[in-house]
Design a protein with these regions (language model features):
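Membrane-embedded alpha-helical segments and adjacent helix-loop junctions characteristic
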Residues: 40-141, 290-378
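Membrane-helix interface "capping/anchor" motifs
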Residues: 13-24, 140-149, 284-291, 354-365
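Hydrophobic transmembrane alpha-helices of multi-pass, membrane-embedded glycosylation machinery
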Residues: 9-10, 26-33, 131-136, 156, ...
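Membrane-core helix-loop-helix motifs of multi-pass transport proteins
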Residues: 137-237, 408-450
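Hydrophobic transmembrane alpha-helices of multi-pass small-molecule transporters
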Residues: 1-63, 199-318, 434-438, 442-450
Length: 450
């Protein structure tokens, strides 16, 4: 009985039974270690040693959560939302078919741009969704925009950006987690252009988005005008000064990331940029000193769960590596597939989809599958670029369609603010169909051609 298979199966089963993911990862690692004959002490030591590998990533998430709340406190999201509402309201008054169509596409483009920027230029991740989307629901109702389409647009911007561009959250996914864990598993990635490698799988996401916009959800859908559930949240009053200082903080945060990244420094530009951005918000008075603790704590709390899951996943991966059961599993899989790379690649992508669906986070999936897939890809003679594409795609698969992923939960949090959007039917299923199917195909093609 292979300890790696048992560990992953136990973890997935518990996660699907809605046991907390952190607990599921810990119990799965414990089961794998015991099956491997490591004993309680050796298993715990391996798990504990792996926890440190996720600490920097978790800290990055916490600081970005604080930065997101600081941006929200400045009133910048409210300005963006109010500007969109005014312009769209003005257009909606002249409701000719052509104006409605143009306005709808402008709204879609605006939401897509914001979701892309939330991963790098304004690194707030999903925090912008409950701030920006609920005020726009009334306008969407007038335009009869299908909210399933908006869920697909939001998910595309969140997932495709971090899996392709190594800036902001993309740096965490591509460099701090993907390349770092692949190198830790023994594969040399020196000189590989990660954007070129992940660009092919990203084309699958683009295809899914185009199908969602122009085929699946192009027809009007009726919604009622209902009040936002829970009433309106007290929002800051935006001022010109706050707007200017917010833009300064955002530009500084983004610029520092780029400078550190392209200077060849090994320092973490995301951590440094976030700290500088937070400092600007504090020193400028946009975030008042007596409220800073509450603002930053609420932001860190928002990202804390994701951080803990990432730390636990690194511990799980460490137990997998120490079990000495990866090599027998690789040998068994190689014997089953022979040297049929096409079938092996498809199987690895499907397994990655299942694991991500169970955990709910592609960021947390990568350390686990990298420990298993790197030796497997080497044994099947996949190139280093093909291996990276396979593991990166296998990790991203499922994030778009997992009921527990932050991408789908964030989309639903905004779109269901008036009670007319179902999480499973209107977010999970549409994003799963439109992204996981073409992403699987594009990832398979990347593995075959790279």
């Amino acid at each position: 009985m292979n300890a790696v298979v048992i560990a992953v199966a136990v973890m997935l089963l518990l996660a699907l039974l809605r046991v907390h993911v952190v607990i599921a990862l810990f119990i799965g690692a414990l089961a794998g270690g015991l099956i491997a004959g490591m004993g309680i002490e050796a298993t715990m030591l391996a798990f504990q040693s792996g926890l440190g590998d996720g600490a920097k990533i978790a800290l990055s998430y916490a600081l970005l959560g604080a930065f997101a709340m600081a941006v929200a406190a400045s009133g910048l999201p409210k300005i963006l939302a109010d500007t969109l509402i005014r312009r769209l309201d003005a257009d909606a008054e002249h409701a000719s078919a052509k104006v409605v169509k143009v306005t709808s596409y402008l709204l879609i483009a605006g939401i897509l741009a914001m979701s892309i920027m939330s991963q790098n230029i304004i690194p707030v991740h999903i925090a912008f969704i409950p701030l920006l989307i609920p005020p726009l629901l009334t306008v969407m109702n007038r335009l009869q925009l299908d909210r399933r389409l908006i869920a697909c647009v939001l998910t595309f911007g969140l997932v495709t950006t971090y899996m392709t561009l190594p800036v902001g959250f993309g740096k965490i996914f591509l460099e701090d987690i993907l390349l770092s864990n692949i190198e830790r598993a023994g594969l040399d990635t020196e000189g590989i252009n990660i954007v070129q490698v992940m660009g092919i799988p990203a084309m699958g996401m683009v295809l899914g988005l185009l199908v969602a916009i122009f085929v699946s959800y192009r027809k009007p859908r009726q919604y009622e005008d209902r009040p936002i559930m829970g009433g309106t949240v007290a929002e800051p009053t935006p001022t010109r000064y706050n707007l200017i200082m917010s833009l300064v903080a955002i530009v500084a945060t983004f610029a520092i990331q780029l400078i550190v990244q392209f200077s060849g420094s090994e320092a973490d530009g995301l951590l440094l940029g976030s700290l500088v951005g937070l400092g600007i918000f504090l020193i400028s008075g946009v975030v008042e000193w007596n409220k800073a603790d509450d603002v930053f704590t609420s932001g860190m709390r928002m990202m804390a769960l994701i951080g803990f899951v990432m730390i636990s996943a690194q511990g799980f991966a460490a137990v997998i590596n120490e079990s000495n059961h990866v090599e027998p599993l690789v040998a068994a899989v190689q014997q089953f597939f022979g040297y049929n790379q096409a079938m092996a690649a498809l199987a690895m992508l499907i397994v990655g989809l299942i694991v991500t669906m169970g955990i709910g986070s592609s960021f947390s999936t990568l350390p686990i599958i990298a420990a298993i897939y790197v030796p497997l890809c080497v044994s099947l003679d996949f190139s280093a670029m093909a291996t990276i594409a396979l593991i990166g795609t296998a990790g991203a698969l499922g994030d778009a369609g997992s009921p527990a992923s932050d991408s789908t939960l964030g989309s639903t949090a905004g779109l269901a603010a008036d009670g007319q959007h179902d999480h499973m039917r209107d977010t999970v299923i549409p994003t799963f169909i439109h992204y996981n199917i073409p992403l699987t195909g594009a990832g398979w093609i990347a593995a075959m051609v790279l």
